[in-house]
Amino acid sequence: MSELSTLARPYAEAVFRMAQDENDLAGWSSRVTTLATIVSDTQVARLIADPAVPADRVAELIVSVAGDGLGERGANFVKVLSANDRLTLLPEISTQFETLKAGAEGTLEATITSAQELSQAQVDDLVAGLKAKFQRAVNVQVAVDPELIGGAVIMIGDQVIDGSVKGRLQRMAFALQG
């Protein structure tokens, strides 16, 4: 995964700079997300992986599926990725673009994974705490993982706040082995 991240980073940064230059972060966010969705389709993925299909033909197909909203620069971006055999990086490019966009907008992306479904009030309380701690707006995604036993794990940026029972048990086991 880190290799994908490393390969995708220059493309994500280039698109981000272009979006900033055009003052169109939201538009480029939509374009990159659309492209990531297209290349994630199983039929398109098979086409991308097929060495018998020329790269320029794959690029044309993706541009066609994406539609007019892609624009000339978006189409050129697809062609560059295709020519360099990097179309499969689009989901990671999209993820990194969104992270850069959130940073530029002063927001953080967080994932809250809890052992049980959280009420909206609980989510709101956690978001308020994160906003206070990080002094930035926070966009959250909530997930449930019963294996946590109890509590929650919050991933925000490259930080992990593990308040789960499973995490506590693992730390105790490690300390006892110690």
UniProtKB/Swiss-Prot annotation:
What this protein is reported to do is described as: F(1)F(0) ATP synthase produces ATP from ADP in the presence of a proton or sodium gradient. F-type ATPases consist of two structural domains, F(1) containing the extramembraneous catalytic core and F(0) containing the membrane proton channel, linked together by a central stalk and a peripheral stalk. During catalysis, ATP synthesis in the catalytic domain of F(1) is coupled via a rotary mechanism of the central stalk subunits to proton translocation. This protein is part of the stalk that links CF(0) to CF(1). It either transmits conformational changes from CF(0) to CF(1) or is implicated in proton conduction.
Record-stated family: Belongs to the ATPase delta chain family.
Source organism superkingdom: Bacteria
What is the native source organism of this protein?
Answer: Thiobacillus denitrificans (strain ATCC 25259 / T1)
Q: Which Gene3D superfamilies match?
A: N-terminal domain of the delta subunit of the F1F0-ATP synthase
Q: Where in the cell is it found?
A: Cell inner membrane
| Keywords, comma-separated and alphabetical | ATP synthesis, Cell inner membrane, Cell membrane, CF(1), Hydrogen ion transport, Ion transport, Membrane, Transport
Q: How does it sit in the membrane?
A: Peripheral membrane protein
Q: What is this protein called?
A: ATP synthase subunit delta
A Pfam family it matches: OSCP
The disulfides recorded in the entry are none
Q: Name one GO molecular function term.
A: proton-transporting ATP synthase activity, rotational mechanism
* HAMAP family, alphabetized: ATP_synth_delta_bact
Taxonomic lineage of the native organism: Bacteria, Pseudomonadati, Pseudomonadota, Betaproteobacteria, Nitrosomonadales
Q: Which InterPro entries match?
A: ATP_synth_OSCP/delta_N_sf (IPR026015), ATPase_OSCP/dsu (IPR000711)
NCBIfam families listed in its UniProt record:
ATP_synt_delta, PRK05758.2-2
Q: What is known about its subunit structure?
A: F-type ATPases have 2 components, F(1) - the catalytic core - and F(0) - the membrane proton channel. F(1) has five subunits: alpha(3), beta(3), gamma(1), delta(1), epsilon(1). F(0) has three main subunits: a(1), b(2) and c(10-14). The alpha and beta chains form an alternating ring which encloses part of the gamma chain. F(1) is attached to F(0) by a central stalk formed by the gamma and epsilon chains, while a peripheral stalk is formed by the delta and b chains.
Give me the gene this protein comes from: atpH
| CC per GO annotation | plasma membrane; proton-transporting ATP synthase complex
Tell whether Amino-acid biosynthesis is among the UniProt keywords: no
